[in-house]
Amino acid sequence: MSTYLIGDIHGCYRELRALLTKANFDPTKDTLWLTGDLVARGPDSLKVLRYVKQLGSAARMVLGNHDLHLLGVYAGISRNKPKDKIDTLLSAPDADELINWLRKQPLLQFDDDLKLLMTHAGITPQWDLETAKMCASEVETMFNSSCYPLFLNSMYGDMPNNWSPELSGLARLRFSTNALTRMRYCFPNGQLDMLCKDKPENAPAPLKPWFELERQIPPEYAIVFGHWASLEGQGTPDSFYALDTGCCWGGQLTMLRWEDKQYFTQSSLPAVKQH
């Protein structure tokens, strides 16, 4: 019985299946944790969603910013960008079922026995473990409610970018969503910077990758995240695991078997020619 952790799939269904085959993943006894961004940019978002959904309890995913954007597009709130390649998904006969399943997925996964935490972008250094769990749960509750389109309409925006327990309403939910699904850099005081997307060596001072600031999460917990493909899985301190290695950009899909820390990779496959 193994625990596998896989980076952002972005519609790269063939690479996903090839990677799981390489690792001898068995959904009847193994568990697959996914860092989010199952959809968009790659060619087969529909197949990825269908596959992960049918894994049932063998899959533990978190929502990423591209997954949230899909929810917005489907609700008629966000614009469908051709580069996301989600038209087939939007028009699928089971689109309703898939979207309703997707919006009920969490933003944070944790296992206290394995001492493992996963979110899409990371955990802001301004949060301790209980605050992270609470804030993720608040956003999840909103997405599970009938008024979730109201939040989708207010989700976009970079402010507020500083955590306070006094934050409330949509502003609090927006901060939490940004911290869990979009964050890369912080100022030294932990404030989020939502603009810089460069590699760490090119980032302007005083910005630091969120994982370089002092954390409030207990040190025995590992934090697993995706989102930041330009890291190429490198440069994080001990107990931080960056798993997005840019498969949809011609890089590779990366998976980690937790029990023995063995990595498995699958290079991006050439596009299938349409006849």
UniProtKB/Swiss-Prot annotation:
Q: Which InterPro entries match?
A: ApaH, Calcineurin-like_PHP_ApaH, Metallo-depent_PP-like
Q: Which gene encodes it?
A: apaH
Per its record, the protein catalyses: P(1),P(4)-bis(5'-adenosyl) tetraphosphate + H2O = 2 ADP + 2 H(+)
- Entry's HAMAP family? ApaH (MF_00199)
Out of the domains of life, which is the source? Answer: Bacteria
Q: What class of enzyme is it?
A: hydrolase
Q: What is this protein called?
A: Bis(5'-nucleosyl)-tetraphosphatase, symmetrical
Asked if the Swiss-Prot or TrEMBL record annotates the protein with the keyword Transferase, the reply is no
Enzyme Commission number, as recorded:
3.6.1.41
What functional role does this protein have?
A: Hydrolyzes diadenosine 5',5'''-P1,P4-tetraphosphate to yield ADP.
Belongs to which family? Belongs to the Ap4A hydrolase family.
Keyword Iron-sulfur among UniProt keywords: no
